[in-house]
């Protein structure tokens, strides 16, 4: 049995589907929605589904640092006899943009662990979907700064491999797409796929910050804007890890869009 936290999100949902297709007994966990309802900020709510679990996928929300303690959740996993944990972290930990406290809790747990460090998500483009549907317009900061956006499906498939195969124990994987792409280029890809013109507006950092603060804590907003606007070389580099684990190249932004074009029509 494999337990998936954050099971309703852009990574959790395809991860549940991938594992189920592989014949695994999957227990989806989220703060609301289908499956077992639990909150990592209240680790005891997770305990009822851990008996007999061979692995757990841990996904924390952006505000988790202010609300919870991952060491406490890891303690519940350890007490429940869970042997393996896979943590969805961030490329920003490796480039010292984000704190390593969650990774430290996992690597010091005494469990088998694998850490996934994805870069910019292709699915962040969902944030433009409503304005594209209703106004054929989108806005983004740093219009011509390119990052190798990763398809959440690739993250899910790498996570599935790590959850099932102990050969991935004590590994840290940086997950990116196959090529860097800027917001302006993403807009062009969406426009071409829809077959209709899309008006692109470049936001200032201050404008983007004001919007992001409505759904993300300030430290996360600032570090995210730093990555988007002034990425370090490592943050713009294409990682070989998706292909290393899956035996195939990572999906392109166009691949992701093709599967999700309905959201933009």
What are these regions (language model features)?
Residues 246-265:
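Amphipathic terminal alpha-helices
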Residues 59-140, 147:
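Glycine-/Pro-rich loop/turn segments that contact NAD(P) or position catalytic residues
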Residues 2-24:
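N-terminal Rossmann NAD(P)H-binding glycine-rich loop of SDR-like oxidoreductase domains
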Residues 141-161, 171, 182:
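Substrate-positioning beta->alpha
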Residues 190-233:
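Terminal hydrophobic/aromatic helix or amphipathic segment near a protein terminus
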Residues 38-54:
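Conserved Rossmann-fold cofactor-binding substructure of NAD(P)-dependent oxidoreductases
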Residues 28-33, 39-40:
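N-terminal Rossmann-fold cofactor-binding loop
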Residues 125-129, 162-172, 233-237, 265:
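Glycine/proline-rich active-site loop of Rossmann-fold NAD(P)-dependent oxidoreductases
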């Amino acid at each position: 049995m494999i337990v998936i936290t954050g099971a309703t999100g852009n990574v959790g949902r395809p991860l549940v589907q991938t594992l189920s297709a592989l014949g695994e007994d999957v227990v989806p966990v989220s703060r609301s929605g289908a499956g077992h309802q639990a909150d990592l900020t209240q680790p005891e709510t997770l305990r009822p589904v851990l008996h007999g679990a061979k692995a757990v996928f841990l996904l924390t929300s952006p505000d988790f640092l202010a609300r919870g303690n991952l060491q406490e959740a890891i303690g519940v996993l350890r007490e429940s006899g869970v042997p393996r944990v896979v943590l969805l972290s961030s490329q920003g930990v490796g480039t010292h943009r984000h704190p390593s406290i969650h990774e430290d809790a996992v690597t010091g747990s005494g469990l088998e662990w694998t850490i996934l460090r994805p870069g910019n998500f292709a699915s962040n483009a969902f944030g433009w979907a409503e304005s594209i549907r209703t106004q054929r317009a989108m806005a983004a900061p740093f219009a011509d700064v390119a990052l190798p956006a990763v398809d959440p499906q690739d993250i899910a498939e790498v996570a599935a491999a790590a959850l099932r195969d102990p050969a991935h124990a004590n590994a840290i994987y940086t997950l990116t797409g196959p090529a860097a792409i800027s917001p302006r280029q993403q807009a062009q890809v969406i426009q071409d796929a829809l077959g209709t013109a899309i008006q692109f507006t470049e936001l200032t950092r201050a404008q983007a910050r004001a919007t992001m603060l409505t759904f993300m804590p300030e430290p996360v907003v600032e570090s995210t804007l730093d990555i988007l606007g002034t990425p370090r070389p490592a943050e713009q580099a294409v990682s070989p890890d998706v292909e290393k684990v899956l035996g195939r190249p990572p999906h392109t932004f166009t691949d992701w869009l093709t599967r999700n074009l309905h959201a933009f029509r």
